[in-house]
Amino acid sequence: MSVVDRISAWARKKSPWLIHFNTGACNACDIEVLATLTPHYDVERFGIQLKGSPRHADVLVCSGPITMQQKERLKTIYDQMPEPKFVVAVGTCACSGGVFNGCYCVEGGIDASIPVDMYVPGCPAKPEAIIDGMVKLLKVFDKDKKKSEGRSQNGKRSE
């Protein structure tokens, strides 16, 4: 791993940047996600910042169930994010489809469309739970860094 890659991995671990996407929620979880980003909770002390572009984000925070209308948009946003990328499902609807599961226009939770790394249940999920999930995700960042350091360019473990 080159010096630039190591610095990039360290910076990414220390300061994950988020993009938030509502896939069809009632907006209760959106209010809680945005409340988490206010000075009252001060998540910037963990280096967490909200970004406006998926090309600059490490973590995709999703709220709401997957609707047919939003499914392709979600995949597009996910594909635009640089590697390594992580997905957090916030709220019961994002985790499992919630009360909307079984509706004609709902396909289920976020994991019905893209892989999810962290689930934060709740209706709505409280800011404290979202922060707890993000702190646990920071540990995944560290494991991902260690895993990538132990692998060569072709994906096999280096000797």
Predicted region positions:
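Iron-sulfur-associated redox domains of electron-transfer enzymes in respiratory
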Residues: M1-E149, R157-E159
